[in-house]
């Protein structure tokens, strides 16, 4: 996990736990699937990424990028902007990881299967 903004409230261990739980909820084993990274960034960085990869010139709270290295070692990266977050950073880690695990949602996120999956993962991982 890389915290470029000094958020300091999400440890690498917790990020790993959340990503692994999201993958398990979809019947996947992160240890077998590969590595996923979580990066916390400033609004300008996420706006630039959102424009570059999605053609949307605005800030967003989370982006997920699927990757596959030559040996399948890298599942992808979840990029989060805490300053833009409409939900908690931990929720966004799970949200991004569910995207990496193959889930998607419509514009009406709160009515989606992905929302229910995210809520279930968060309930199971709350300390």
Give the predicted meaning of each segment.
Residues 1-93, 97-127:
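An acidic/histidine-cluster motif and surrounding catalytic segment
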């Amino acid at each position: 996990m890389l915290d470029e903004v000094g958020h300091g409230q999400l440890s690498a261990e917790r990020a790993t736990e959340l990503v692994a739980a999201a993958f398990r909820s979809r019947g996947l084993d992160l240890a077998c699937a590969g590595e996923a990274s979580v990066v916390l960034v400033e609004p300008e960085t996420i706006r630039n990424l959102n424009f570059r990869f999605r053609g949307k010139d605005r800030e967003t709270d989370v982006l997920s990028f699927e990757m596959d290295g030559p040996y399948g070692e890298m599942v992808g990266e979840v990029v989060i902007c805490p300053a833009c977050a409409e939900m908690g950073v931990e929720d966004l880690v799970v949200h991004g990881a569910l995207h990496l695990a193959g889930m998607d949602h419509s514009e009406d996120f709160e009515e989606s299967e992905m929302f229910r999956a995210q809520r279930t993962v968060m309930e199971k991982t709350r300390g």
